[in-house]
Amino acid sequence: MEFPKALIKRPNYHFEYPHKRKDKRIGRGFSIGELEKAGLNINNARKLGIIVDIRRKSVHEENVEVLKKFLEQLSNQKS
């Protein structure tokens, strides 16, 4: 099973062309708010192998959905 990756917004730089810029990039890990919305805490997430970025404060709904799907897959495997 592949572990989920967090997506975050890329910073805007004035020297980049808009057509070369991507809207999202792969982040360092999931924020604490995203974990809480998905029903996890930091210790349980780290035991499951999910990387946690404690510095990030933003909560992206796409990441919450990815975490929920990952937890469903884990529960289906245990059954």
From Swiss-Prot:
HAMAP family linked: Ribosomal_eL13
Family annotation (InterPro entries): Ribosomal_eL13
Top-rank lineage group of the source organism: Archaea
Family: Belongs to the eukaryotic ribosomal protein eL13 family.
Keyword Cell membrane set for record: no
GO CC annotations, alphabetized: ribonucleoprotein complex; ribosome
UniProt GO molecular function: structural constituent of ribosome
Record keywords: Ribonucleoprotein, Ribosomal protein
UniProt protein name: Large ribosomal subunit protein eL13
Biological processes annotated in GO: translation
Keyword Ribosomal protein: yes
Record field: transmembrane: none
